A protein has these predicted regions:
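Bacterial N-terminal signal peptides that target proteins for export
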Residues: 1-10
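Bacterial N-terminal signal peptides
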Residues: 10-21
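Surface-exposed beta-strand/loop patches in extracellular or lumenal glycoproteins
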Residues: 551-568
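Catalytic cores of secreted or luminal carbohydrate-active enzymes
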Residues: 483-537
């Protein structure tokens, strides 16, 4: 793990310890009393105020007899709440089921499909707390005598908590909601803080106020959003099943930082399974399964930065397994993204992300997809830059393995592209990308297609092919060990003192697919450069080799040669322009090496043959 991730994890741990300690000390409460319960009949609201903890039984016993709070099924501890319940000034509501000694195994929240006043209720903590454990909570339509499944035409019951600054503008008034071992469903509609389960900090106070809670071992389903946070700090979402929500499954939003999202099964939601959006930093998103969602499996959106996405399984999502949108400095590794539309996509200026050891295979379109998009980035020009894609598997995708557009200065290294149904990479309007030591095999179009307006580099690679699509595009083939390349256009390798290269463009490649093979053969001139063209390179039989070299200058050039693919411990003659120059015995790896000094102004021909 990098120092940066260790640092982020350490900071997160400290934050969790701090906030847990803070709330255990500051939210320790007194017993519930009648003085803390106020019934407002005109607004159909119950207010619980002060430093107290109240259960439904206590509210029923101590509050007004007119509060519409009833036990509809005493034997099964089923309650019905027909009023809005508001927690203020540090008050805490306890909703515990019988498995942990509580009084409510199911809570039904009034949610009638009608336009009349007070047709639905909410539970809200505005500087307070809600503790839900081992129970079930649903909306309830009294007329239908059943769960309220309608969310579009009429409003629907929901639960939310708020944190804010006090009227002095300085003192934080913070709330917390914990949900464990519970079944929460059929809550919320499309309205601010009304999505179903919501944690929110008032806008403008993120730097001094947080909202808190842990969500563990629950089933959360058929809400408008499964979970929504806004300004949350150090929350944990652990081992939940989140499914069949209208929009998102898990949606940490604005400035929700230092969250742990681990071990959740998020599926069949209407849009993205897990989306973290707008300045959500230092997240740990691990070991989740996100599948059959209407959008992306996991999405990092609008400056969701400095986060770790690891060991997630993402399949059968309508868009991409993972999407990075206008987000930066994240590490994505060891994720498995299959059977989606795309394995991964980056857009709107996403930069400086590390994507390594992932599997982006068997997707219905692209394994990897990069594009600027039409959205305005929060900074920069929107092009995809300075990302590293290393040691990923991109196999058997239905279309292009890597679709690259408006992407610059990215590194693709050590990736496996096998059995895809189109190009290895289709590159358009993208410059200064480096493709290094990737494996290309069995793709229907087993080559890099430099389609349009693209100038890039292939570096330190063994076997590959390239097609140039227009006159302003090129691909520079380079090798840091000065290797010579044999290629289907018989183009010379330009050997320099510190590297070798071939610049492939439309002029020398035409419309052909040009195949390249990096030979076990390097030439390193001390000065100047040499154009080296292999003519014969036998790797079996007589192991003979032949090449030409020329500099075009009249001064003497000394060049170090390493020739491989020879039989070990066998003597070989080096013949220059038909004259025996010297003999060498190949070492145990089948190589000979020598320095040769001469004037290479005109073409010189070299032969290596087994000594007679």
């Amino acid at each position: 793990m990098s120092k940066k991730l260790i640092s982020a994890s350490f900071i997160l741990l400290i934050a969790i310890i701090f906030f847990t300690t803070f709330f255990s000390e500051t939210m320790a409460a007194s017993p519930c009393s009648a003085a803390n319960i106020r019934w407002a009949a005109s607004s159909n609201r119950v207010y619980i105020t002060g430093d107290v903890e109240c259960t439904l039984t206590e509210i029923k016993q101590l509050g007004s007899k007119y509060i519409p709070l009833t036990v509809s099924d005493p034997a099964n501890k089923v309650w019905f709440l027909g009023a809005k319940l508001i927690l203020q000034n540090g008050a805490k509501l306890i909703l515990h089921g019988s498995p942990i000694g509580g009084d409510v195994d199911e809570l039904r929240l009034k949610s009638n499909n009608a336009t009349s006043t007070n047709n639905f209720v909410i539970i809200q903590a505005d500087w307070g707390g809600i503790d839900i454990d081992s129970t079930k909570i649903v909306s309830w339509d009294e007329v239908a005598s059943g769960i309220d499944t309608e969310y579009a035409l009429y409003k629907r019951a929901y639960i939310n908590i708020r944190s804010r600054l006090d009227i002095d503008g300085v003192t934080p008034r913070e709330s917390r909601m914990d949900i464990k071992n519970s079944d929460i469903g059929y809550l919320g509609y499309n309205g601010a803080e009304a999505y179903g389960l919501a944690w929110k900090v008032s806008s403008g106070s993120f730097d001094t106020v947080g909202v808190f809670g842990d969500v563990t071992n629950n089933t959360i389903h058929h809400n408008y959003f499964g979970v929504y946070t806004y300004g949350a700090q150090a929350m944990t979402f652990l081992n939940n099943e989140v499914y069949d929500n209208v929009k998102y499954g898990l949606d940490p939003h604005d400035d929700s930082d230092f969250l742990i999202i681990d071990g959740n099964y998020v599926h069949n939601n209407g849009s993205h399974g897990i989306i973290c959006s707008q300045r959500c930093d230092n997240l740990i998103i691990t070991n989740n399964t996100s599948s059959y969602n209407g959008g992306n499996g996991i999405m990092l959106h609008r400056n969701t930065n400095d986060s770790l996405v690891e060991y997630n399984t993402l399949y059968n999502n309508a868009d991409s397994g993972i999407a990075i949108f206008d987000s930066h400095r994240n590490t994505l590794r060891n994720n498995d993204a299959k059977y989606n539309k795309n394995g991964i996509r980056l857009s709107v200026g996403s930069s400086n992300n590390i994507v390594e050891n992932n599997n982006f295979s068997e997707n219905s379109k692209y394994g990897m997809y990069f594009y600027k998009g039409s959205d305005v980035p929060t900074s920069g020009d929107g092009r995809i830059k300075f990302n590293t894609f290393r040691n990923n598997i991109i196999n058997t995708n239905i279309s292009v393995a890597a679709k690259i557009q408006q992407a610059d200065s990215n590194i693709f290294e050590g990736n496996e592209f096998v059995g895809n149904s189109s190009y290895v990479a289709e590159i358009k309007d993208s410059d200064s990308n480096i493709f290094k030591a990737n494996t290309l095999s069995g793709n229907i179009k087993n080559y890099y297609y430099v389609k349009q307006d693209a100038v890039n580099t292939i570096q330190d690679s063994d076997f590959f092919a390239v097609k140039i699509g227009d006159t302003i595009s090129s691909m520079t083939i380079t090798d840091s060990a000065n290797a010579v390349f044999k290629n289907s256009k018989n183009l010379p390798t330009n050997a320099y003192p510190s590297y070798s290269s071939i610049v492939l463009d439309r002029a020398n490649a035409g419309s052909s697919i040009v195949g390249f093979n990096r030979l076990s053969f390097s030439i390193t001139p001390a000065t100047e450069s040499l154009d080296v063209k292999p003519l014969t390179w036998n790797t079996s039989g007589d192991f003979s080799k032949k090449w030409t070299a020329v500099s075009g200058v009249s001064s003497t050039t000394t060049a170090a040669h390493i020739i491989g693919n020879l039989a070990p411990s066998v003597s070989y003659d080096v013949i220059v322009d038909g004259i025996l120059w010297n003999s060498f015995i190949a070492d145990g790896s089948g190589e000979i090496s020598f320095d040769y000094a001469d004037v290479f102004q005109n073409i010189k021909t070299f032969d290596v043959r087994e000594s007679l």
